[in-house]
Amino acid sequence: MAQAKADTPEAGLKALMAALRKQGVTDPAVLTAIEKTPRDLFTPDLFKERSWEDSALPIACGQTISQPFIVGLMTQALTLEPRCRVLEIGTGSGYQTAVLSRVSRLVYTIERYRTLMKEAEARFAVLGLTNVITKFGDGWEGWPKQAPFDRILVTAAAQDEPEALLSQLKPQGVLVAPVGKGPVQSLRRYAGDGKGGFTVEVLCDVRFVPILDGVARE
Protein backbone atom coordinates (compact mmCIF):
# COMPACT_ATOMS: atom_id res chain seq x y z
CA MET A 1 0.00 0.00 0.00
CA ALA A 2 1.74 3.18 -1.20
CA GLN A 3 1.15 6.33 0.79
CA ALA A 4 0.95 9.79 -0.75
CA LYS A 5 4.20 11.24 -2.09
CA ALA A 6 6.09 13.23 0.55
CA ASP A 7 7.86 16.56 -0.02
CA THR A 8 11.11 15.47 1.66
CA PRO A 9 12.86 12.17 2.47
CA GLU A 10 12.36 12.88 6.16
CA ALA A 11 8.61 13.32 5.69
CA GLY A 12 8.52 10.21 3.52
CA LEU A 13 10.25 8.14 6.18
CA LYS A 14 7.92 9.45 8.88
CA ALA A 15 4.86 8.56 6.78
CA LEU A 16 6.28 5.13 5.99
CA MET A 17 6.94 4.31 9.64
CA ALA A 18 3.40 5.35 10.54
CA ALA A 19 2.03 3.12 7.76
CA LEU A 20 4.05 0.13 8.98
CA ARG A 21 2.77 0.52 12.53
CA LYS A 22 -0.80 0.82 11.28
CA GLN A 23 -0.41 -2.43 9.31
CA GLY A 24 0.87 -4.37 12.31
CA VAL A 25 4.65 -4.05 12.34
CA THR A 26 5.03 -3.22 16.02
CA ASP A 27 8.29 -4.82 17.18
CA PRO A 28 10.41 -1.85 18.39
CA ALA A 29 13.70 -3.40 17.29
CA VAL A 30 12.38 -4.10 13.79
CA LEU A 31 10.93 -0.61 13.43
CA THR A 32 14.21 0.93 14.55
CA ALA A 33 16.16 -1.22 12.09
CA ILE A 34 13.94 -0.10 9.21
CA GLU A 35 14.07 3.53 10.31
CA LYS A 36 17.89 3.46 10.40
CA THR A 37 18.29 1.74 7.02
CA PRO A 38 18.25 4.31 4.18
CA ARG A 39 16.09 2.63 1.54
CA ASP A 40 17.09 5.21 -1.04
CA LEU A 41 20.61 3.72 -0.98
CA PHE A 42 19.15 0.46 -2.31
CA THR A 43 16.79 1.78 -5.00
CA PRO A 44 17.84 2.49 -8.62
CA ASP A 45 18.26 6.14 -9.64
CA LEU A 46 15.08 5.96 -11.73
CA PHE A 47 13.03 5.27 -8.59
CA LYS A 48 14.88 7.34 -5.95
CA GLU A 49 11.89 9.62 -5.44
CA ARG A 50 9.78 6.57 -4.61
CA SER A 51 12.20 5.11 -2.07
CA TRP A 52 9.92 5.80 0.89
CA GLU A 53 6.75 4.49 -0.69
CA ASP A 54 5.37 1.32 0.85
CA SER A 55 5.66 -0.53 -2.44
CA ALA A 56 7.99 -2.96 -4.21
CA LEU A 57 10.27 -1.43 -6.85
CA PRO A 58 12.20 -2.92 -9.79
CA ILE A 59 15.97 -3.45 -9.53
CA ALA A 60 18.52 -5.04 -11.86
CA CYS A 61 18.33 -8.60 -13.23
CA GLY A 62 14.53 -8.58 -13.32
CA GLN A 63 14.30 -8.63 -9.52
CA THR A 64 12.61 -6.29 -7.03
CA ILE A 65 13.28 -4.55 -3.75
CA SER A 66 10.50 -5.70 -1.46
CA GLN A 67 7.70 -3.56 -0.10
CA PRO A 68 8.80 -2.17 3.30
CA PHE A 69 5.72 -3.65 4.97
CA ILE A 70 6.71 -7.13 3.78
CA VAL A 71 10.29 -6.54 4.96
CA GLY A 72 8.96 -5.54 8.35
CA LEU A 73 6.45 -8.38 8.53
CA MET A 74 8.97 -11.07 7.60
CA THR A 75 11.64 -9.71 9.93
CA GLN A 76 9.14 -9.50 12.78
CA ALA A 77 7.94 -13.06 12.10
CA LEU A 78 11.47 -14.36 12.64
CA THR A 79 11.31 -13.27 16.31
CA LEU A 80 14.98 -12.37 16.18
CA GLU A 81 17.28 -12.07 19.16
CA PRO A 82 20.66 -10.30 19.22
CA ARG A 83 22.48 -13.65 19.43
CA CYS A 84 20.89 -15.08 16.26
CA ARG A 85 22.78 -16.33 13.23
CA VAL A 86 20.52 -15.79 10.22
CA LEU A 87 20.60 -17.29 6.73
CA GLU A 88 18.99 -15.19 4.00
CA ILE A 89 18.17 -16.72 0.64
CA GLY A 90 18.23 -14.01 -2.03
CA THR A 91 20.30 -10.93 -1.23
CA GLY A 92 18.75 -8.85 -4.00
CA SER A 93 19.39 -5.15 -3.44
CA GLY A 94 20.61 -5.88 0.09
CA TYR A 95 17.86 -3.85 1.78
CA GLN A 96 16.34 -6.77 3.67
CA THR A 97 19.85 -7.96 4.53
CA ALA A 98 20.74 -4.60 6.03
CA VAL A 99 17.60 -4.60 8.16
CA LEU A 100 18.38 -8.11 9.40
CA SER A 101 21.94 -7.12 10.25
CA ARG A 102 20.68 -4.54 12.74
CA VAL A 103 18.69 -7.06 14.77
CA SER A 104 20.92 -10.15 14.70
CA ARG A 105 24.52 -11.20 15.37
CA LEU A 106 25.47 -12.51 11.93
CA VAL A 107 23.70 -12.59 8.57
CA TYR A 108 24.76 -15.12 5.93
CA THR A 109 23.22 -14.16 2.60
CA ILE A 110 23.24 -15.99 -0.75
CA GLU A 111 22.62 -14.43 -4.18
CA ARG A 112 22.53 -16.17 -7.58
CA TYR A 113 23.16 -12.95 -9.55
CA ARG A 114 26.78 -11.81 -9.25
CA THR A 115 25.80 -8.30 -10.37
CA LEU A 116 23.34 -7.91 -7.51
CA MET A 117 25.75 -9.41 -4.99
CA LYS A 118 28.54 -6.97 -5.88
CA GLU A 119 26.19 -3.99 -5.74
CA ALA A 120 24.83 -5.12 -2.37
CA GLU A 121 28.34 -5.61 -0.98
CA ALA A 122 29.21 -2.04 -1.94
CA ARG A 123 26.13 -0.78 -0.09
CA PHE A 124 27.00 -2.80 3.02
CA ALA A 125 30.45 -1.18 2.96
CA VAL A 126 28.91 2.30 2.75
CA LEU A 127 26.77 1.52 5.80
CA GLY A 128 29.67 -0.05 7.68
CA LEU A 129 27.89 -3.37 8.14
CA THR A 130 30.54 -5.82 9.34
CA ASN A 131 28.26 -8.69 10.36
CA VAL A 132 27.08 -9.62 6.85
CA ILE A 133 28.72 -12.55 5.04
CA THR A 134 27.88 -12.90 1.34
CA LYS A 135 28.01 -15.87 -1.01
CA PHE A 136 27.48 -16.16 -4.76
CA GLY A 137 25.59 -19.40 -5.25
CA ASP A 138 22.38 -21.39 -5.45
CA GLY A 139 20.25 -20.28 -2.54
CA TRP A 140 17.97 -23.31 -2.79
CA GLU A 141 20.89 -25.42 -1.53
CA GLY A 142 21.36 -23.24 1.53
CA TRP A 143 24.75 -23.01 3.22
CA PRO A 144 25.43 -26.44 4.79
CA LYS A 145 28.96 -25.59 5.95
CA GLN A 146 27.63 -22.81 8.17
CA ALA A 147 24.53 -24.66 9.40
CA PRO A 148 22.66 -24.95 11.65
CA PHE A 149 21.10 -21.50 11.74
CA ASP A 150 18.87 -19.90 14.35
CA ARG A 151 16.71 -18.29 11.68
CA ILE A 152 16.29 -18.58 7.92
CA LEU A 153 14.56 -16.04 5.68
CA VAL A 154 13.68 -16.80 2.07
CA THR A 155 13.05 -13.77 -0.15
CA ALA A 156 11.88 -15.62 -3.27
CA ALA A 157 8.95 -17.98 -3.72
CA ALA A 158 9.52 -21.69 -3.15
CA GLN A 159 7.23 -23.91 -5.22
CA ASP A 160 7.40 -26.71 -2.67
CA GLU A 161 8.17 -27.14 1.01
CA PRO A 162 11.75 -25.87 1.59
CA GLU A 163 12.97 -29.16 3.04
CA ALA A 164 16.67 -28.62 2.26
CA LEU A 165 16.57 -25.32 4.12
CA LEU A 166 14.53 -26.66 7.02
CA SER A 167 17.21 -29.31 7.52
CA GLN A 168 19.73 -26.49 8.12
CA LEU A 169 17.67 -24.96 10.91
CA LYS A 170 18.32 -25.47 14.62
CA PRO A 171 15.76 -27.68 16.43
CA GLN A 172 13.88 -24.67 17.79
CA GLY A 173 14.68 -22.33 14.94
CA VAL A 174 12.32 -20.34 12.72
CA LEU A 175 12.11 -20.19 8.92
CA VAL A 176 9.94 -17.69 7.06
CA ALA A 177 9.29 -18.16 3.34
CA PRO A 178 6.74 -17.51 0.60
CA VAL A 179 5.52 -20.87 -0.71
CA GLY A 180 3.37 -21.51 -3.78
CA LYS A 181 3.45 -22.22 -7.51
CA GLY A 182 1.25 -19.39 -8.78
CA PRO A 183 1.64 -15.61 -8.94
CA VAL A 184 0.25 -15.38 -5.40
CA GLN A 185 1.93 -17.37 -2.64
CA SER A 186 1.32 -17.90 1.06
CA LEU A 187 3.86 -16.45 3.46
CA ARG A 188 4.60 -19.24 5.91
CA ARG A 189 6.34 -19.36 9.27
CA TYR A 190 7.93 -22.69 10.23
CA ALA A 191 8.78 -23.01 13.93
CA GLY A 192 10.85 -25.96 15.11
CA ASP A 193 9.35 -27.93 17.99
CA GLY A 194 12.72 -29.14 19.27
CA LYS A 195 11.97 -32.73 18.26
CA GLY A 196 12.55 -32.58 14.52
CA GLY A 197 9.07 -31.36 13.62
CA PHE A 198 7.60 -27.99 12.74
CA THR A 199 4.45 -26.03 13.34
CA VAL A 200 3.44 -24.04 10.27
CA GLU A 201 1.57 -20.74 10.37
CA VAL A 202 0.27 -18.98 7.26
CA LEU A 203 0.75 -15.24 7.74
CA CYS A 204 -0.76 -13.75 4.57
CA ASP A 205 -0.81 -13.84 0.77
CA VAL A 206 2.22 -12.36 -0.99
CA ARG A 207 3.70 -11.94 -4.47
CA PHE A 208 7.37 -12.86 -4.86
CA VAL A 209 9.54 -13.76 -7.83
CA PRO A 210 10.21 -17.53 -7.85
CA ILE A 211 13.37 -19.20 -6.60
CA LEU A 212 15.47 -20.33 -9.55
CA ASP A 213 17.93 -23.22 -9.49
CA GLY A 214 21.62 -22.68 -10.06
CA VAL A 215 23.45 -19.40 -10.57
CA ALA A 216 23.04 -16.75 -13.25
CA ARG A 217 25.60 -15.52 -15.79
CA GLU A 218 25.04 -11.90 -14.82
Swiss-Prot record:
Function: Catalyzes the methyl esterification of L-isoaspartyl residues in peptides and proteins that result from spontaneous decomposition of normal L-aspartyl and L-asparaginyl residues. It plays a role in the repair and/or degradation of damaged proteins.
GO molecular function: protein-L-isoaspartate (D-aspartate) O-methyltransferase activity
Any one of the GO CC terms: cytoplasm
Keyword vocabulary terms for this entry: Cytoplasm, Methyltransferase, S-adenosyl-L-methionine, Transferase
Enzyme class name: transferase
SUPFAM superfamilies xrefs: S-adenosyl-L-methionine-dependent methyltransferases
Gene: pcm
Enzyme Commission code: 2.1.1.77
Cellular compartment(s): Cytoplasm
Name of the protein in question: Protein-L-isoaspartate O-methyltransferase
Record organism: Caulobacter sp. (strain K31)
GO process terms (BP): methylation; protein modification process; protein repair
Entry annotated with the keyword Cytoplasm: yes
